[in-house]
Amino acid sequence: MCRTLLGVAFLVVTVLSQGEKDLIQNLPGLLFKANFKSYSGYVDANANGTWKMHYMLTESRSNPDTDPLLVWFNGGPGCSSLGGLFEELGPFYVNFDGQTLYENPYAWNAKANVLYLESPIGVGYSYDTTTPGYFQANDDQSAAQNYQALTNFFNVAQPKYTNRTFYLSGESYAGIYIPMLTDLIVQGINNPNQPFPNKNFQGSAIGNGFMNVAGLLNALTLWSAYHGRVSEQNWADIKANCSKGADVDSFDFSQFTTSQNKIDYVGDGSYCGNLIQPLISQNALGNEGFDQYNFYQECYDKSVFQAPPPAGGKRHKRSAMQGVSSVQKNLQYQQLGNFQGTSNLAKNTATLVNRFSNDNQFGYFCWNEDAVSKYLNSDNVQNALNIPQAWKDQKNTWEDCRMSIYNNYTLKYNTTNRFFNNIITNLTTDFRFLIYNGDVDTVCNYLGDAKHILQVAKDNGLTSGPRTPWYYSNNQQLAGYVQTYSGKNKNNAMITIDLLTVKGAGHMVPYDRAGPSVQMISNFVWAPKNVVINYTSQDNFNPNIQLSDLVDSGSSSTVAFFISMFAVLLNIVF
């Protein structure tokens, strides 16, 4: 008996040390005192352990020992989930010096432990130990890697979460990752021979999801037509000669398109293909003067920020106007940094005007990729994040989005209907989906996702509720609209799908509408089972954010800038 107990005690200590070894002891450049722990390490994404998937975990600011786990995936395919952490929903935003971190007061770890997985292998810090520069990926392989990685996370990396309620979440191409992974997890939970280690799987959230290729193309044609991107004459021509009098709301415009990778589509050169090309264009080359990820947001000038060029990756995300002189740069930098407290702000409110973009966060989205790339490619940061020498020996660099994966990726499923249908059919316990969309995104538009979910609901006999507004609690301003589909399957499990829009947000909802986004996700993960979620509720989110204390700093200008950024962030309504 004593020998058995000793063995159990040794095993517990071993497991705990396995999880705690990934604790980040000192995150370089952190300008505020974090009241939560962060972890960075690796999980095995295949059975023999040669595929190493990097993860970061930011524990909840509230009750990390009991709060649910929220798993986050960025899309691409080929984009790092650390982009989501440092550019959207995480607690750390990178200053334009690429060296320091200021606080995002609207981070999603307000009442959840958030796990970021860099998927698939080859993205970010994830790597193949046997094949340097391994950048081959496809939908089935990504799903298998994600399933194995999450299994390893619960069993080995952080076993304290094995019995915790958990949810999946992500955006963009995660609209394919998440339904496929959800399907695999449900199958695993139902498999008595090789069960998934955590059975407390309660929901999945997809933001601006790439879930139905043709549906998104057809809906973008309509969205663009009604957002002034075509003349009345050309639209009449399209209806007369392309849809030929058929209902344009249900017409398949995608038949006039072509693609080399089944992800990016252009007009096929036919008469109708040429007519719809201006409507389906998403400014992929960055030469059309608008941001495809947020139709109404601009970067007027990102050259004022002294960040290096990005390490590589993404198709043009943000375009900016012609650069300015070094004298102008210095002047504008001083106007940003030399607030020195609220007294000077009161003297000259004009210093608050942001001339770099049309947002109120100092154009963060215009330059954050460059700053984040610089930060995550520094040796001291990589050491703090427990990045192994084996990854460095492969001459890797961290990239926000790795184009070598994007260009080699094989899309196998151009619609996710089958996965939603499998999930809904096979669930044995209550489950909920949140399908949310910023309503001014052209890459994965809200209308295409709404039509897709309507079809899923019809296929599975779900009942439609009314479409109602939801409000941001801080000032009761309209935050968007929500509609719920619900019903029970053959196993008597209640399934709900909340179809929600976020007013004025684009592709990156957690950045574009920070306050409403964290209110939305907190209500989703904390709402009781079998209820219609009230996304306006303050029960799970306090909009009166209390900022963390600052760490001591020898640089008064850095602290001044940090304070000014806080002042701006706290005045965000949307």
From Swiss-Prot:
Its EC number is 3.4.16.-. GO terms for molecular function: serine-type carboxypeptidase activity. One of its GO terms (cellular component) is membrane raft. GO terms for biological process: proteolysis. Glycans are attached at N48, N163, N241, N408, N414, N426, N534. It comes from the Eukaryota. Residues 1-19 form the signal peptide. This is Serine carboxypeptidase ctsa-3.1. It comes from Caenorhabditis elegans. The gene is ctsa-3.1.
